[in-house]
UniProtKB/Swiss-Prot annotation:
Transmembrane segments: none annotated. InterPro entries: Dual-sp_phosphatase_cat-dom, mRNA_Capping_Enz/RNA_Phosphat, Prot-tyrosine_phosphatase-like, Tyr_Pase_AS, Tyr_Pase_dom, TYR_PHOSPHATASE_DUAL_dom. Monomer. May interact with SFRS7 and SFRS9/SRP30C. This is RNA/RNP complex-1-interacting phosphatase. It comes from Bos taurus. It holds the Pfam family DSPc.
Amino acid sequence: MSQWHHVGGHWGQDRVFSGYSSAKKKGGNHIPERWKDYLPVGQRMPGTRFIAFKVPLKKSFEKHLAPEECFSPLDLFNKIQEQNEELGLIIDLTYTRRYYKPEELPENFPYLKIYTVGHQVPDDDTIFKFKNAVNGFLRENKDNDRLIGVHCTHGVNRTGYLICRYLIDVEGMRPDDAIELFSRCRGHCLERQNYIDDLRNGPIRKNWDSSVSRTRGFEDSTHMMEPVFTATKPVNRRPKHNIHQTQGYPEPRHFHTWTQDLQQSERKFSQNWNIYQRCHVPPPGPPGEDYFQRRYSWNVKPSAGQGGPNKRFSPGSYYRVPYSAYYRWTK
């Protein structure tokens, strides 16, 4: 059986990625159910680095869509650039690989896949992976203002839950404030009552790996994530690995070096940490409306400095990741 191994020695043969191997393969290019009902991209959540969006679809899906319905990885970057924002990381929570490939993102762009089962509250391991990824990104990008883009299929339920879970557990935000902020900025409200109930009434999740001591939590937790980059060499020159040989796990990509940084840090999670500055959040939508109504949405107004229609993203103009990346594949 083929597995990943971290070059620095923190990946072993007993380390197995969780989640995807039990997923059923879904072939074809059928549009995800209700995908058209949702806005492609929300707005940045004020006081945070988060922006949520629905899953972009690769070009082969476009034959099933009207031109105005298309939303590709390239469209994603254009829409975020139109908000005068810059994306620095994508966290993909979908439980499949069929919607788009990391190779369709700009060269060397940081991309992290966390297979997250839909409809049910994410387990503690998934929550911990997400927190680790966000913390690592913030630590390495404290001198810039790049955003963390998070998506599931619709960019609402799994996405909203994990973003809110982070804001509640790490930033000390009140659950209703976190839910309200996400809903207003996404343009759609959290729909699943089990997610809402857990955010409001569920326990605060630990910010370290429950299977190890706190002082070694970050060091031993890197196996729980799957950081990958788009390939830096042409796609047709990459070695091919059969999905059955890899038991459904993603093909090897480049490791993000923030895993090394994670191994040496133990962060104090504080309610008054300055990533989120508490402020009044106006109700999301028209007065008197119940914003927990299923799939209720309202118009998202563009940012004041929104760029013009001629301001378009081109892969060659995007920034390069200022650190090395590497991987090793063993059998």
